[in-house]
Amino acid sequence: MTHLFEGVGVALTTPFTNNKVNLEALKAHVNFLLENNAQAIIVNGTTAESPTLTTDEKERILKTVIDLVDKRVPVIAGTGTNDTEKSIQASFQAKALGADAIMLITPYYNKTNQRGLVKHFEAITDAVKLPVVLYNVPSRTNMTIEPETVEILSQHPYIVALKDATNDFEYLEEVKKRIDTNSFALYSGNDDNVVEYYQRGGQGVISVIANVIPKEFQALYDAQQSGLDIQDQFKPIGTLLSALSVDINPIPIKALTSYLEFGNYELRLPLVSLEDTDTKVLREAYDTFKAGENE
């Protein structure tokens, strides 16, 4: 079995203009990603500010992306919530719109135990019958999909991947022991650890920074797959990532997507934009990165 994708999937931002979703800016951004070698597009996830999008907005965004991508790369819809039934409903809608797969975050706030996690994920997957990417991000949910639980879930024919945002290589190694990596993909959820994640056998990354440097980030994966040492190639990307860490995702990345004119620099409360000085420093870091490419 082939993996859902290999290399860089982009955790897509949502462009706003005057607090409304700007679908034209969204189309321009998606075209930019497709032209620059993105291998998958993830819609309505954390980076998209999904908690502050209405159901109607999520559906319009997803339909716009699916229609534009037109099967050139997989479109993965974030449909997971901390309510199993609502997650099923959202997943059915994503399937009806033509999503290639869904991404399911662990329940948050009303967090469960590992047995509950299995039942939650299996209930959604059994109902919808679309490929599923599990999303493990304990820093946001205070809930971890333990390696033993990943092993159980990986045996389901529709559960095909894990987005691993633990930034914990011991966790990665323990998961790897328990799954068949020929049929179950491991994607990093942390842009800054991809060099080691790839070296340890990861199949790719679901990336924030690839919103603005998709070609360069995919080239890193391709070089590693060719057997090259990518430490030096990563260094300028690492410098840009350090600048991007000035605040919580997606606050900084939207300072850059707006710089590329994919919507205004707007976020929905409770998120707020960077201070002007931080925005200037971040955009200068991006300019420095791009200038270095052209030397």
Swiss-Prot record:
Keywords, sorted A to Z: Amino-acid biosynthesis, Cytoplasm, Diaminopimelate biosynthesis, Lyase, Lysine biosynthesis, Schiff base
Protein name: 4-hydroxy-tetrahydrodipicolinate synthase
General function of this protein: Catalyzes the condensation of (S)-aspartate-beta-semialdehyde [(S)-ASA] and pyruvate to 4-hydroxy-tetrahydrodipicolinate (HTPA).
A single BP term in Gene Ontology: diaminopimelate biosynthetic process
Organism: Staphylococcus aureus (strain JH9)
PROSITE patterns: DHDPS_2
Molecular-function annotations in GO: 4-hydroxy-tetrahydrodipicolinate synthase activity
Stored InterPro entries: Aldolase_TIM, DapA, DapA-like, Schiff_base-form_aldolases_AS
Quaternary context: Homodimer.
